Swiss-Prot record:
<feature type="compositionally biased region" description="Basic and acidic residues">
    <location>
        <begin position="62"/>
        <end position="75"/>
    </location>
</feature>
<dbReference type="GO" id="GO:0005737">
    <property type="term" value="C:cytoplasm"/>
</dbReference>
<keyword id="KW-0744">Spermatogenesis</keyword>
<feature type="lipid moiety-binding region" description="N-myristoyl glycine">
    <location>
        <position position="2"/>
    </location>
</feature>
<feature type="binding site">
    <location>
        <position position="148"/>
    </location>
    <ligand>
        <name>Ca(2+)</name>
    </ligand>
</feature>
<keyword id="KW-0879">Wnt signaling pathway</keyword>
<feature type="binding site">
    <location>
        <position position="155"/>
    </location>
    <ligand>
        <name>Ca(2+)</name>
    </ligand>
</feature>
<keyword id="KW-0479">Metal-binding</keyword>
<dbReference type="InterPro" id="IPR040140">
    <property type="entry name" value="Nkd-like"/>
</dbReference>
<dbReference type="GO" id="GO:0090090">
    <property type="term" value="P:negative regulation of canonical Wnt signaling pathway"/>
</dbReference>
<keyword id="KW-0217">Developmental protein</keyword>
<feature type="binding site">
    <location>
        <position position="144"/>
    </location>
    <ligand>
        <name>Ca(2+)</name>
    </ligand>
</feature>
<keyword id="KW-0472">Membrane</keyword>
<dbReference type="InterPro" id="IPR002048">
    <property type="entry name" value="EF_hand_dom"/>
</dbReference>
<dbReference type="GO" id="GO:0030165">
    <property type="term" value="F:PDZ domain binding"/>
</dbReference>
<dbReference type="GO" id="GO:0060026">
    <property type="term" value="P:convergent extension"/>
</dbReference>
<dbReference type="GO" id="GO:0003401">
    <property type="term" value="P:axis elongation"/>
</dbReference>
Length: 471
């Protein structure tokens, strides 16, 4: 350390603040305290030449003389014994120091001092503690030199040079009396921190270890808080987290299925092939659907309205079905035929999303008999492969397509009236239908729906033709 602190002043850099000014030292100067510290060295010459600053530094809690009485730091080009520092303290207070570096010091309250005369700065106040009425210490608290909690030897050296310059410029030098000013710098940690060793290497290690230990802990706590806030995990219980996670997943799946049901179940459940649901299951699905397909509970009311008109117009068409059981089975099969049988005539998927209960749907159902003979060649598996939920919505396009075919195929439909009326007695009873399996029931209903569909739509078409096509 003696080698370091015996460097010339030109090697040591002057400590500057971010503003570029010199570092101001806040201290209250008293004549009695300084006289106790000063080694009496008097020189009859003037004090205009280079001055010598004798330094005794206390680093940490152990005292270590940086310069001492033997090793002195030369601040000028001349020999240190020829031109010692002589400071003449003025009898009055001096308020001539106003430095830009005063912001870097903490302002401390100044209690009453036993000394009568002291040097007081403009804005800075420091504590003055009197010990044994013979010594006086000035305590000034500094911020971190490098703003990183580390104090280096170069910082202390430059700080001592700054103290020397500030004191030299702030005191009036009297040519009559010469006194030597001895500055004692003590660098000590705060009382709240742990004890540090005298060496700066140990100080650096101890100052960096608490930060390295506490920083990951604080980051971990902050991360736990961030995790607890959105997910609402309680404490650090790792057993509750998987349960909550699985519960959220199940809830999301249920919510998704609910929205899929609201959007329309026919878009997500395929009704193709032999694995399709039965007629009883299909009758349960449409009540969930809001608009695209009407449920069976609403279809008989809409279907009875056109059915009653041909009964009043053509009462002779139902002469083979006079018994109440036959009429009931005929109406039941006819209603199912209007829904299931209409799917055999759909060839274009352009008119989806329209309702069956509208008048266009009724007209489309009436104008479809020309394609009836082609449905006899379709296999029952092809009947199963058509979706009843989508096909009734395609009806409105049919009556526009088949208007021109209605007149051409009217004779063929009338030719089929006799065999279809004769085959009307082959309607199965309700008991026989219930005994069959689901797929067989669907096939038999599809076959009966074709026959009843032809017969039913023939008469409706006849009624429709007389009312709408006659000029």
């Amino acid at each position: 350390m003696g080698k370091l602190h015996s460097k010339p002043a030109a090697v040591c850099k002057r400590r500057e603040s971010p503003e570029g000014d010199s570092f101001a030292v806040s201290a209250a100067w008293a004549r009695k305290g300084i006289e106790e510290w000063i080694g009496r060295q008097r020189c009859p010459g003037s004090v205009s030449g280079p001055r010598q600053l004798r330094l005794a530094g206390t680093v940490g809690r152990g005292t270590r003389e940086l310069v001492g009485d033997t090793s002195r730091e030369a601040l000028g080009e001349e020999d240190e014994d020829d031109f010692p520092l002589e400071v003449a303290l003025p009898p009055e207070k001096i308020d001539s120091l106003g430095s830009g570096d005063e912001k870097r010091m903490e302002r401390l309250s100044e209690p009453g001092q036993a000394s009568k005369k002291q040097l007081k700065f403009e804005e800075l106040q420091c504590d003055v503690s009197v010990e044994e009425d013979s010594r006086q210490e000035w305590t000034f608290t500094l911020y971190d030199f490098d703003n990183n909690g580390k104090v280096t030897r170069e910082d202390i050296t430059s700080l001592l040079h700054t103290i020397y310059e500030v004191v030299d410029s702030s005191v009036n030098h009297s040519p009559t009396s010469s006194k030597t000013l001895r500055v004692k710098l003590t660098v000590a940690p705060d009382g709240s921190q742990s004890k540090r060793s005298v060496l700066f290497n140990h100080t650096d290690l101890q100052s960096t270890r608490p930060r390295a230990d506490t920083k990951p802990a604080e980051e971990l706590r902050g991360w736990e808080k961030k995790q607890r806030a959105p997910l609402r995990f309680q404490g650090d219980s790792h057993l509750e987290q998987p349960d909550c996670y699985h519960h959220c997943v199940d809830e999301n799946i249920e919510r998704r299925n609910h929205y899929l049901d609201l959007a329309g179940i026919e878009n997500y459940t395929s009704q193709f092939g032999p694995g399709s649901p039965s007629v009883a299951q299909k009758s349960e699905l449409p009540p969930r659907i809001s608009n695209p397909t009407r449920s069976r509970s609403h279809e008989p009311e809409a279907a009875h309205i056109p059915h009653r008109r041909p009964q009043g117009v053509d009462p002779g068409s139902f002469h083979l079905l006079d018994t109440p059981f036959a009429k009931a089975s005929e109406l039941q099969q006819r209603l199912r035929g209007t829904q299931d049988g209409s799917k055999h005539f759909v060839r274009s998927p352009k008119a989806q999303g329209k309702n069956m209960g509208m008048g266009h749907g009724a007209r489309g159902a009436r104008s479809k008999p020309p394609l009836v003979p082609t449905t006899h060649t379709v296999s029952p598996s092809a009947h199963l492969a058509t979706s009843p939920a989508l096909l009734p919505t395609l009806a409105p396009l049919g009556h526009k397509k088949h208007k021109h075919r209605a007149k051409e195929s009217q004779a063929s439909c009338r030719g089929l009236q006799g065999p279809l009326a004769a085959g009307g007695s082959t309607v199965m009873g309700r008991e026989q239908v219930r005994e069959l399996p689901a797929v067989v029931v669907y096939e038999s209903q599809a076959g009966q729906a074709v026959q009843r569909h032809e017969h039913h739509h023939h008469h409706e078409h006849h009624h429709h033709y007389h009312h709408f096509y006659q000029p």
